[in-house]
């Protein structure tokens, strides 16, 4: 340790004497494996990571529960990825740099369900990435042994993992219905019956099934998702509140009034907008129906429209 420090001071001293930029000294020092950082064998990497919240409870097909508490890793180029089913996904840079990146790519959150099938495990609320949190979707695929087979980043800070396991090779291994308590199965039966009897629409059917999966604990309710969604930024506010709707409506009404004014001013007849589709009619067809000469001699109208 003392020798290392002496060497560090020597290197700093040398670089201070020469014209080398500050970065040069840094580069030399990091070649030495050091005792301060991530690679300290006495300080396990994982203990340095601070999870934002606890993972969701273990849920889904019972035969997968035995994976809970285990971890599977994959080294790809300079990173080691680690998937701990029903717990987390982490990433560890494999270098001797003192500030090697180690991070949480997601904490077990909820299942993805499609077509009566568990199609993926969502791990969310990972380390910050710009204004969002890193998140990972883990697909379960049939394989000879348990292994993390593939990792990619299809969009920024959203990771896609493939985990192979013999536990999902049976064609019914990931079906949702058999995992449900009987009461929820009866509810599901009723929902299907109502759809068949056309008492509910396909959209209503989707919505009822979603609620049912939330009750089972497979999906999180929108309130439970809120922290993640809010991190999506101001854009995600949209029409969520009545206040926003009123504002948007007021602005659209003003715009319609302005456009109508333009049409009137130029003697172009228009139909009263009763539906949104009429806006298009107003914008394109009516002027086209007029003699083209009138429009051509009127650049002001075209520019404004
Ligand atoms: C990830 O999950 C594993 C397995 O349960 C656990 O030992 C580890 O502490 C977790 N890591 C983080 C950063 O929460
Ligand atoms: C839905 O799942 C069934 C098996 O459960 C399968 O036969 C069918 O092809 C799937 N449909 C779609 C659209 O994925």
Swiss-Prot record:
Homodimer; disulfide-linked. Hexamer of two alpha (GNPTAB), two beta (GNPTAB) and two gamma (GNPTG) subunits; disulfide-linked. The alpha and/or the beta subunits of the enzyme constitute the catalytic subunits. Residues 69-171 form the MRH domain. GO terms for biological process: carbohydrate phosphorylation; N-glycan processing to lysosome. This is N-acetylglucosamine-1-phosphotransferase subunit gamma. Cys-245 mediates the formation of the interchain disulfide bond for formation of the homodimer. Cys-142, Cys-157 and Cys-169 are involved in intramolecular disulfide bonds formation. Non-catalytic subunit of the N-acetylglucosamine-1-phosphotransferase complex, an enzyme that catalyzes the formation of mannose 6-phosphate (M6P) markers on high mannose type oligosaccharides in the Golgi apparatus. Binds and presents the high mannose glycans of the acceptor to the catalytic alpha and beta subunits (GNPTAB). Enhances the rate of N-acetylglucosamine-1-phosphate transfer to the oligosaccharides of acid hydrolase acceptors. It is linked to Mucolipidosis type III complementation group C: Autosomal recessive disease of lysosomal hydrolase trafficking. Unlike the related diseases, mucolipidosis II and IIIA, the enzyme affected in mucolipidosis IIIC (GlcNAc-phosphotransferase) retains full transferase activity on synthetic substrates but lacks activity on lysosomal hydrolases. Typical clinical findings include stiffness of the hands and shoulders, claw-hand deformity, scoliosis, short stature, coarse facies, and mild intellectual disability. Keywords: Disease variant, Disulfide bond, Glycoprotein, Golgi apparatus, Mucolipidosis, Secreted, Signal. Residues 281-296 have a biased composition (Basic and acidic residues). The keyword Transferase does not apply. Disulfide bonds join 71-84, 129-157, 142-169. Residues 267-305 are annotated as: Disordered. Changing residue 126 to S: In MLIIIC; loss of localization to Golgi apparatus. Widely expressed. One of its GO terms (cellular component) is extracellular exosome. It is found in: Secreted; Golgi apparatus. Glycans are attached at residues 88, 115. It comes from Homo sapiens. One of its GO terms (molecular function) is protein homodimerization activity. The keyword Signal applies. Residues 1-24 form the signal peptide. It comes from the Eukaryota. Residues 176-279 form the DMAP1-binding domain. Its main location: secreted. SMART domains: DMAP_binding. Changing residue 230 to V: Rare variant; found in individuals suffering from stuttering; uncertain significance.
